[in-house]
From Swiss-Prot:
Source species taxonomy: Eukaryota, Metazoa, Ecdysozoa, Arthropoda, Chelicerata
Name used for this protein in its record: Dermonecrotic toxin LvSicTox-alphaIC1bii
CDD domains documented for this protein: GDPD_like_SMaseD_PLD
Lipid metabolism keyword on record: yes
Record's subcellular location: Secreted
The keyword Iron is assigned to this record: no
Organism per entry: Loxosceles variegata (Recluse spider)
Record-listed E.C. numbers: 4.6.1.-
Gene Ontology annotations of biological process type: killing of cells of another organism; lipid catabolic process
Length: 272
């Protein structure tokens, strides 16, 4: 999966898909009442990027629905969306409420209340393990609204670079048994080693691990892309999807990796 990083403005959806992204990451900020408010990152952000692009969350989600509905030219090119949920602005006790409000919002504006809505898979990426009740609030709301089937399209990620064992324990608390992506990374302005990504890959490949897929961020340089592929990740989050495509076409990688398609299930662990 080639994950376009920090896609917060409607025009950027086209821009990143045209460069080769089949997935995008979008930042979601919340108001004081735990409503998703803007798709916005703010400063500081990755080197070489405009940190201030934004939309109202509802407007972005409606545009995303259009892009990921059959009949749209992007439909079979963009099929995974990571919502990077900026919950650090919320009190811990608001996490469940944020999950409820996010679910209601996506149900209405993205899934069109279950009536021919957007088809992309969604990952809820949460920066704080203490906010695991966002997941339970989200799940319960879709069930209460009569749309438990939409949870088939939803996965989870804790993005705080916590110890993998602690992440697994938190999923157990939340009752999550699958649909788990694990991120690891750092801004493109800095370097980060592969110790934790290797631990995440080991969990993914072990019999009793909870992780289904692993992705690394933010990978912009050619050598960093090669090093990341050598770590056997499933996804690369990048500001330059065209560079990822270029490296995947190199002899060393083109037989080992392929770019995911709509038919690939992002919740299935790949077995060699």
């Amino acid at each position: 999966w080639i994950m376009g990083h920090m896609v917060n403005n409607i025009k950027q959806i086209d821009e990143f898909v045209n460069l080769g992204s089949n997935a995008i990451e979008t930042d979601v900020s919340f108001d004081k009442k735990a409503n998703p408010e803007y798709t916005y990152h703010g400063t500081p952000c990755d080197c070489g990027r405009d940190c201030l692009r934004w939309e109202y969350f509802n407007d972005f989600v409606k545009a995303l629905r259009t892009a990921t509905t059959p009949g749209n030219s992007k439909y079979d090119k963009l099929f995974l969306v990571v919502f990077d949920l900026k919950t650090s602005s919320l009190y811990d006790y608001r996490a469940s409420e944020a999950g409820t409000k996010l679910a209601k919002n996506l149900l209405q504006h993205y899934w069109n209340n279950g009536n021919n809505g957007g088809r992309a898979y969604i990952i809820l990426s949460i920066p704080n393990l203490k906010h695991y009740k966002l997941i339970t609030g989200f799940q319960q709301t879709l069930k209460d609204e009569g749309h438990a089937e939409l949870l088939d399209k939803v996965g989870y990620d804790f993005s705080g670079n916590d110890d993998i064992g602690d992440v697994q324990k938190t999923y157990e608390k939340a009752g999550v048994t699958g649909h788990v992506w694990q991120s690891d990374g750092i801004t493109n302005c800095l370097l980060r080693g592969f110790t934790r990504i290797n631990a995440a890959v080991a969990n993914r490949d072990s019999a009793n691990g909870i992780i289904n897929k692993v992705y690394y961020w933010t990978v912009d340089k050619r050598q960093a892309t090669r090093d990341t592929l050598d770590a056997n990740v499933d996804g690369i989050m990048t500001n330059y999807p065209d560079i990822t495509v270029e490296i995947l076409n190199e002899d060393a990688y083109k037989t080992k990796f392929r770019i995911a398609t709509y038919e690939d299930n992002p919740w299935e662990t790949f077995k060699e």
